[in-house]
């Protein structure tokens, strides 16, 4: 498979501000400390200090959230590494969406992992990816649907409160509808 890089501006999906920031436009330089490149990340890493109490709280919270889940060896290794004062994190996240949301959500996850691995090699220090899901800060109507092409698939209901605690009543019908739109063949599994 041939890889063809597409520059951010060519996608037409990012504002001029984002494109200017990523290209290093001098007029924006006063608004951030470190450039969004490997040298900027290296400089930022050298300045970061994580309070021991905050680090312990993060590890304890992650272990609690993973309770009852069989963890992949890499996750176990990263949790143990997070306890060390020298370990850094690449932290990103996303607002919860039906079916994970746009494709850039898994892309964000994979890039956080890749960046953590790259920085571990470049810095000579362990860097662990941390991804948070914003499940508590928005209303159901913001996340109860997905667009599959021009077809809107919607999860019916009106439950209130934190989205992360809502019952999954009716979700099977939504999944079935998505399968009907996408198809159930081998290509749909990709």
Locations of regions flagged by a protein language model:
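N-terminal targeting/trafficking signals and adjacent low-complexity tails
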Residues: 1-190
């Amino acid at each position: 498979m041939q890889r063809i890089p597409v520059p951010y501006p060519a996608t037409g999906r990012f504002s001029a501000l984002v494109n200017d920031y990523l290209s290093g436009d001098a007029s924006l330089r006063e608004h951030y400390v470190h450039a969004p490149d490997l040298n900027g990340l290296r400089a930022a890493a050298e300045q970061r200090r994580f309070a021991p109490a905050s680090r312990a709280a993060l590890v304890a919270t992650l272990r609690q959230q993973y309770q009852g889940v069989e963890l992949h060896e890499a996750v176990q290794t990263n949790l143990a590494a997070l306890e060390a004062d020298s370990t850094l994190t690449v932290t990103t996240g996303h607002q919860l969406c039906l079916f994970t949301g746009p494709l850039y959500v898994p892309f964000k996850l994979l890039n956080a992992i890749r960046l953590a691995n790259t920085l571990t090699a470049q810095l000579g220090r362990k860097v662990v990816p941390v991804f948070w899901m914003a499940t508590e800060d928005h209303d159901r109507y913001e996340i109860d649907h997905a667009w599959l092409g021009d077809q809107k698939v919607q999860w019916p209901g009106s439950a209130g409160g934190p989205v992360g605690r809502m019952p999954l009543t009716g979700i099977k019908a939504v999944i079935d509808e998505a399968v009907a739109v996408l198809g159930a063949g081998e290509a749909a599994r990709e």
